[in-house]
Amino acid sequence: MGNKESLLIDGLKKCGLKEEAIPTIAEKMETYINEIILFNSAYNLTNTSDHDELVIRHILDSYAGYKKIAELAESLKNLGIEKLQFADIGSGGGLPGIPLAAAFPEIEFTLVERMSKRCAFLENCAAILGLKNVKVLNKEAEKIPAESFDLITFRAFRPLDQKMTKTLLNMIKKGGFFVAYKAKIENIKEEMSGIENLIKEYQVENLLVPGLEDSERNLVVCVK
């Protein structure tokens, strides 16, 4: 195993993924990283094309929320929902949607992205990686039909203002969740104070990203 592969595999273990699934997921993610590097300059997918930075700042950052999202998925299944519908809003290059879809093959993932060229990239990645549980929707978040999804994720997306929060709440089914990947707790509190009329309660889960131990990362979980 080379240093590049071990960086990813060690990180996946630390993020709590199922041991038996890690080799397959790691192989898919290495292929995905290669696709990002190949198309990044043309599609402006991420802020780096360096392999190790992509592993740490994007793939492992996405998987740092794995355990919490697995817990939320289990709680939704306990409500009797047979086929969970998740969405990644403003998916861009597919983060965290593609990594999460690879880890939860039993859950349907919709990657929502308004830019058509990025949608073409996402469709290509889903095909190459064999992610049969992924579909790509070329649409503005505001145009998603009401109560379409059980859980939505977003990362490096717009701030949670009044308009965006109403849009997100509208597309989630009753009892569903939206999960935001965010940075500093001070900024989160400021954002959430501006929408306290819409979100009465929320949970902040501190994320430990392997390789980014000195950077503050949090997951904000809101329930409808």
Predicted regions and their residues:
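Conserved class I S-adenosyl-L-methionine
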Residues: 80-92
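S-adenosylmethionine
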Residues: 106-224
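Alpha-helical structural signal in soluble globular domains
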Residues: 11, 26, 103, 194-198
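Class I SAM-dependent transferase core
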Residues: 2-81, 117, 124-132
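Conserved SAM-binding loop of SAM-dependent methyltransferases across substrates and taxa
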Residues: 93-106
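Mobile beta-alpha loop/short-helix "lid" or hinge segments that flank ligand
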Residues: 33, 91-96, 139-141
